[in-house]
């Protein structure tokens, strides 16, 4: 037996807009320099990845990514400063919640260690 912690953010209409999927996409953009590359790493369609990012940006009210159009050197995407800050805060909050949940689990179910 185990307990799991899942952090999901909802907007004012109670619509999910940010969780582990969009966070992984943003990390992937940092690693690959493109939304298409990040989506590919996750075996996700580019259109779905774009929709996830756009939904999160609409709910947050600021851009998470900035895209450059192709050309000789090719296009790409990168995180905005606000995007980097949001991702960092999300990951820190998620990790703190996981640790708190683990501690509570051990207190309430000590026989399950």
Where are these regions (language model features)?
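Central "turn" residue of the DNA-binding helix-turn-helix
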Residues: 43-44
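Short, Lys/Arg-enriched N-terminal segment that forms or immediately precedes the first helix
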Residues: 1-14
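Short helix-boundary/capping micro-motifs
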Residues: 32-40
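Alpha-helical linker/hinge and terminal dimerization helices associated
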Residues: 89-107
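Basic, amphipathic "hinge/linker" alpha-helix immediately C-terminal to the N-terminal HTH DNA-binding motif
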Residues: 67-90
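Residue cluster at the C-terminal edge of the helix-turn-helix DNA-binding motif
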Residues: 58-63
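Residues within the DNA-recognition helix of helix-turn-helix
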Residues: 52
